């Protein structure tokens, strides 16, 4: 089911009863001033554009990433092993806010920097073994509004769409990752920078 704060989550009003999908969306969870300050500071971290192999061919990921977390935490996705850099106060502040809203504990965060409309992330689920059987994912958006889409794993059926805006918090509760895929598609319209933080617990 969906819980939505302040406005309708999806363009389709009938989605409140989606099976095996539990998503909470808090619009403007971070005030405009807070979101501006966080975005300004997060731009300064050491971003990296990783190289991945798709069907035997090397490609640069269409976004930049950074990985932070507790000591010793590592995470593998798209064939890349990420070793966490230590938390710093600004990230700690955001983590506390997300933990309070979600009721979950997070020991790491993956940051994605979408530089413009040419950056995105393909269909996927955050269901790697390191995340445990029933992960909760806390996703914070700063910067440009971008489309967020969702569809069932079991069939290539209807795609459900919303936009995530500056300061929004989206929480994907279990069992969402087991049954649904999500993506941030590249945009046909010119966009500016967006930074997304996805908090998670590595077990």
Report each predicted region and the residues it spans.
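Non-heme Fe(II) oxygenase metal-center motifs and adjacent flexible, charged/small-residue loops
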Residues: 1-203
